[in-house]
Amino acid sequence: MLVSDYHFDLPDSLIANYPMPDRTASRLLHLDGHSGEVVHRQFPDVLDLVQPGDLMVFNNTRVIPARVFGQKESGGKVEILVERVINVNEALAHVRASKSPKESSKLILGQDKGEHIEATMIGRSGALFHLVFDEPVLDVLMRAGHMPLPPYIERPDEDSDQERYQTVYNQKPGAVAAPTAGLHFDEALLEKLKAKGVETAFVTLHVGAGTFQPMKVENVKDHIMHAEYVEVEPSVVEQVKAAKARGGRVIAVGTTSVRSLESASQSGEIAPMQGDTSIFIYPGYEFKTVDALVTNFHLPESTLIMLISAFAGYDHVMAAYKKAVEQKYRFFSYGDAMFVTRNPQAKGPQGEE
């Protein structure tokens, strides 16, 4: 199974640089995983695709303004992207500069926002730099940080992104990328789901910048996933078990919710979980908990389109993406969405199992 099997041609004009004026105004491509049938809908139609007794599981992570600009003591420009807050004053970060900062060197950050914040580079962890700040990291980011828009959105962040690159139900700060399927839900739609008898549950997965990193292998099975923090509380486990017992479906909102639930189900049955996951889901994976999912359209040759292919089958997914391009759906973080049901006989490229 090759990474190149997951390539598709996407015109730049279909990459959404801004969200729709209203959260629910996006289009929704409904893919029946079993048959491969595609129906073109509007996002509020998700109400017609769920049933009383279903459980929708959302990721309640909050995107932190993790991108900070500044300079080295030498005066050279520097840009940091905090990947993970380790403790109050320390973080692991990607650092972009003409020359990488040396150990013990200082960075002066936040001048573009009228701040003067110092951080010291005390070591490295792989590609990440270990930084110690002179004040709490989250305080620094709230004052001096910019929303970390994905690299394919080719514009500076704007004030509106502070709201629109967050879900309305975010609770726990820690992500450096939004769980984008959730961006389509507003309070009114959540209330309508509740009124229909659909239960909701919340997991936490702090999305890392690694989600945008291109795969650097040719063979899919050689790829090693980056680790991300996940939390599935005992109450969520009970909700999942109750939904299954009453014949309801577990519907994951976003690939991060899928990865959270499946990470907590590796023993064969879902159990509480708190810690890192590096689960990599691609065709051949046997889903243990998730029955349907809501997701945006993903990058060619990405781990996320592989996850969707594992869920609904490679041929069905690639055919659906082809139709989405033909119908000019909007792609990626601020784009349109899919509602996908699971195909128990899903296969990979060339019928691989």
Curated annotation (Swiss-Prot):
Gene3D superfamilies: QueA-like (3.40.1780.10). Pfam families: Queuosine_synth (PF02547). It catalyses: 7-aminomethyl-7-carbaguanosine(34) in tRNA + S-adenosyl-L-methionine = epoxyqueuosine(34) in tRNA + adenine + L-methionine + 2 H(+). It is an enzyme of class 2 (transferase). Its EC number is 2.4.99.17. GO terms for cellular component: cytoplasm. One of its GO terms (molecular function) is S-adenosylmethionine:tRNA ribosyltransferase-isomerase activity. GO terms for biological process: queuosine biosynthetic process; tRNA wobble guanine modification. It is found in: Cytoplasm. Pathway: tRNA modification; tRNA-queuosine biosynthesis. Coiled coil: none annotated. It comes from the Bacteria. The keyword Acyltransferase does not apply. The keyword Repeat does not apply. Monomer. Belongs to the QueA family. Transfers and isomerizes the ribose moiety from AdoMet to the 7-aminomethyl group of 7-deazaguanine (preQ1-tRNA) to give epoxyqueuosine (oQ-tRNA). PANTHER family: S-ADENOSYLMETHIONINE:TRNA RIBOSYLTRANSFERASE-ISOMERASE. This is S-adenosylmethionine:tRNA ribosyltransferase-isomerase.
